């Protein structure tokens, strides 16, 4: 028991920081009820006021994604000038300032209907920049831990994000407004505290050794992002990649399994799970009339969340083993949000082609299932992509703790 508890030492501040940031992103621009201040308890009028002032065809999630992708691409190109990010005051200030400004814009929008469109668009752009930088700052902190702790802290933070989101969505307008302002403040303070407690020898270095990018891994993740994007706007309630019920279910299973069975934890099995879940999810799409949309939606959302989690774990491991700044790897992964955005346009294009709904579902199912299955089999046959040992066995505790 003491050994298990020791695994969690040193991660409380990171978990709080990332959990608050994920909840904030979901409550502002990335969640299903984003921008509706106060939620069901008291914010319906506020959310309606914002919606009435914004053209029905405009989605601030798009402008959030746009800013998020652009700032990620910029960091991919210029990361050598700024790393380590946590030593760069300008980066930390821009991240915190943009997140706080976005919160203020969301809070003010219902009270200033004539300016709500500008506030929400500007706020979404600021949120994308701030959150994109925050994730890279947080990645530098997390990369200082052992692989097993990275697994536990990352899943624990995502769990916390869902819990915070759940409670905030039930608040009244004033409480929710205060929460939206407080969350980025807390996230930034906790992250600063987490970085300050990292020993100097384990902090990210300024130099960048020669390295090659794991392009095949990024291609695989891009395919999953594209596949998820095609169904992202049609998922049932509670399914989604951000702080949702499907995320809670997945992260609870991962955290508890790693915590209570760390010595027998088989990551190789996890590597093979996303393709099974994704294909099953898309095969259930045509059968929604019989099984309901929930089964398909949850399988698709859990699959994409699991793949995203595993890709991050692989990138952290590659960064630690090769001494490469995690910022560049995570920035590329974040920029691949572009594939989800593009995938989201496919259903509309198929509808414009005049195909019946059943035919559209069938076409999407066949194409995505074949692509995902072929790509996964091909790419994960490459031994350099991960930590799966050549004998095929699970990673041992020694593998996890190797510094």
What spans do the regions from the language model cover?
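Flexible interhelical linker loops that connect adjacent transmembrane helices
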Residues: 191-220
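Hydrophobic core of transmembrane alpha-helices in multi-pass small-molecule transporters
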Residues: 116-136, 292-309
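C-terminal ends and interior cores of transmembrane alpha-helices
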Residues: 96-113, 276-290
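Membrane-proximal linker segments that couple transmembrane helices to downstream signaling/catalytic modules
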Residues: 375-403
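Central cavity-lining transmembrane alpha-helices of secondary-active solute carriers
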Residues: 59-82, 249-258
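Intracellular juxtamembrane helix-capping segments at the cytosolic ends
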Residues: 131-145, 307-322
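Helix-loop boundary and gating motifs at the non-cytosolic
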Residues: 1-72, 216, 220-240
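A late C-terminal transmembrane helix in Major Facilitator Superfamily
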Residues: 324-352
